[in-house]
Amino acid sequence: MAGHSKWANIKRHKWAQDAKRSKIFTKHIREITVAARLGGPDPEMNARLRLALDRAFAVNLPKDRADAAIKKGAGLEEAEAYEEIRYEGYGPGGSAIMVDCMTDNRNRTVSEVRHAFSKHGGKMGTDNSVAYLFQERGVLVFAPGTDSDQVLEVALEAGADDLVENDDGSLEVLTTPEAYRGVRDALTEAGLEPEQADVTQRPDLTVQIEGDNAVSTARLIERLEDLDDVQHVYTNADLPAEAYEEG
């Protein structure tokens, strides 16, 4: 199966995350706390907590801070009560955008998200206005030049659904959320280490956005990601790499 270029956007995203490490740590700690509260403190028995820890350690969150977040979530220490909310909307040029938040103040969060959409030429939608365009999938991305035959063989044997070969030569292994952990472990054990791996909301189809709309969409995504209450931003926009460098 063929797909669009992902590599430049992934590298850009990793650079942006590194540049905001302190805020990123706070968001990961919040995710760990909520996961432990909802499913218990044992990552072997709590898939959401295990994924939250994977994400946190991928950006080098210290283990002692992760352990403290688990204790808070499990009720062993006092913790804030966060509510999970999803907002949906449209970017400039008509791309779909979903914004997952954790907040202790719903009014503040919706105001900030709405302002970001409005400022950058987008608009808020209603519940389920764009969610149907995405599926929750495990996605493991490999750099251009990775042996696609080997990745395909190991991934399918471990329970993956598909291998996407992107225009730039990068590879995406797709799994169900349930199969994600086993597929990732099998690939790693075979010496195939993904550059990026996560359970995410993957669009069924992407929308190519160009020119000024692409720059505005990139600014919108970056602004949403920078909001304190926002945990994840998903879009079906296929943006050129230079969109993140302009504006």
Swiss-Prot record:
Biological processes, Gene Ontology terms: regulation of DNA-templated transcription
Recorded GO MF terms: DNA binding
Entries under InterPro entries matching the protein: Integrase-like_N, TACO1_YebC-like_2nd/3rd_dom, TACO1_YebC_N, Transcrip_reg_TACO1-like, Transcrip_reg_TACO1-like_dom3, YebC-like
GO cellular component: cytosol
Pfam family, one: Transcrip_reg
Assigned keywords, A-Z: Cytoplasm, DNA-binding, Transcription, Transcription regulation
Subcellular location: Cytoplasm
Alphabetized Gene3D superfamilies for the sequence: 1.10.10.200, 3.30.70.980
Bridged cysteine pairs (disulfide): none
PANTHER family in alphabetical order: TRANSCRIPTIONAL REGULATORY PROTEIN YEBC-RELATED, TRANSLATIONAL ACTIVATOR OF CYTOCHROME C OXIDASE 1
Family classification: Belongs to the TACO1 family.
UniProt protein name: Probable transcriptional regulatory protein Hhal_2210
UniProt organism field: Halorhodospira halophila (strain DSM 244 / SL1)
